[in-house]
């Protein structure tokens, strides 16, 4: 069976891994890095950049450079957290027709283009897919993609949509802490252990309590409880620092950098760099010359930042991670002292203040033998190998992070599946009508822990109609909830009297209909096609350039031996080729290059013959004519070798 790759689709960085010969390998991207920035940029000439290249041009293209998109995936525009983000990012977040949070960028014609978060995330997944394909040497179709454990149903569905748009068959969506536990637990000694995975990434925080046990020779990974906050991560730490630096600058210079997208982007980069530096040093300087200007001239930002200052700015963010830890331990039915190991995942856990908070809560040092940037992708690759049958002794028992239920009389949420229930799972309950002769019921599906229906996340609603008229409380409507291994919910309602049934796969709030997803798949494929054509055009230009250089060199080497007619004929073809290279017609460039090749190959033969004679051939026309005759008798593909010969001879002359 073909490999199933593991992808950690992160808020800040993404990573891809694959299992080969029983070992997991994290794959380096084209730039040689094991992680890729989850950044997508749309340039003014219509190119789509992903990763390091997108990050590099962010300062000069701030409103078209999209980062931290994972914070918007599966979210409604009116969510408080989205509204907060709108004020903080240089790109434009808009309300889609269905109420979801989308992004608006200008295309190369300057027209507004609306993009759904799964569509943008798909570009990162395409890069991850290509990275794996370049390494493996063949096409990759199947993947396991990770999501934060505390992602709700619509966020999971939106992630699956992103995979589909990227041309991937998403075999499984698994939780990031569970993946990290797989990476940690696979090579550990036998025996039961209870571990806490503390995952503080770029945009989300998760805590999972996982029991690793040996059951009949199998590694069993059972998630006992999970908790978290899907809008708390390294980006929030950066924002605190950006606000502080902007505030200090405003105090000193009277200019608010929040109003200048270019300055804000430079400040973001500097804040991120300073935060990372302060994990290993006690102080750093944030130095940004010419950050902005006013009537009095250019302004420079130069602020000394200490680790203590940074820690005081983010103290409450670190503290916010502890409450979910308490809840998860309680839900798992354990005491803190019963946790054997603590694993840190996510780049933000490198901050000493975070490590100290974890140590104080769990009463032990976190393990350092797990790479916080790569563990999740490694775990996803292991799960991929389990699904493909390459690994046979692993059983993964994950849970649903939030309770699921429906709205009942009085605006109450009635839970059918409690949080931390092992998945896949199925539950049903019988409900009835609220009014006499009621012929239809609306099933409103909710996810969350609050008693009030309105305080929970609405996942979707559907109607069951044609119920025979009867007094209230008489009809029996059986509602069934079925969660698959991806944590995605299927709901059905059945009238027991008539057998009539209505069902729904919860995807309404992921915002994308099947038609929209299909359209985005086609768009992505078209984009891949245009990318391929672009690369072919660049290759054609490069080959043409090399041919022009070779022809001009031959003319120069032969000097006065080239007749005026020959020279003008070659110059004419060279000029025509240069003109073709300015355009975008690959075939025209190829045709002109071939014409130049025909002209220059004759010159090349003469250069070769001349050099051959100079290299010590016996005097006389016969010896000089031999290489000429041979070269003339052979096909064009010999021409390259002839040029090599010239270079070698030149080098020998230089060495002398």
UniProtKB/Swiss-Prot annotation:
Q: Where is the composition biased (Basic and acidic residues)?
A: 647-656
Q: Mind telling me which InterPro entries this protein's record contains?
A: ATPase_NBD, Chaperone_DnaK, Heat_shock_70_CS, HSP70_C_sf, HSP70_peptide-bd_sf, Hsp_70_fam
Q: Where is this region: Disordered?
A: 602-656
**Pfam families, A to Z:** HSP70 (PF00012)
Q: Give the UniProt keywords, A-Z.
A: ATP-binding, Chaperone, Nucleotide-binding, Phosphoprotein, Stress response
Q: Which residues carry this modification: Phosphothreonine?
A: 204
Q: Which domain of life is it from?
A: Bacteria
GO MF annotations in UniProt: ATP binding; ATP-dependent protein folding chaperone; unfolded protein binding
Q: Ranges of Low complexity compositional bias?
A: 620-632
Q: Per its record, what triggers expression of this gene product?
A: By stress conditions e.g. heat shock.
Q: Which family does it belong to?
A: Belongs to the heat shock protein 70 family.
What is the documented function of this protein? Acts as a chaperone.
The record's NCBIfam families line, in alphabetical order, gives: PRK00290.1, PRK05183.1, prok_dnaK
Q: What is this protein called?
A: Chaperone protein DnaK
Q: Which organism is it from?
A: Coxiella burnetii (strain CbuG_Q212) (Coxiella burnetii (strain Q212))
Supply the gene name. dnaK
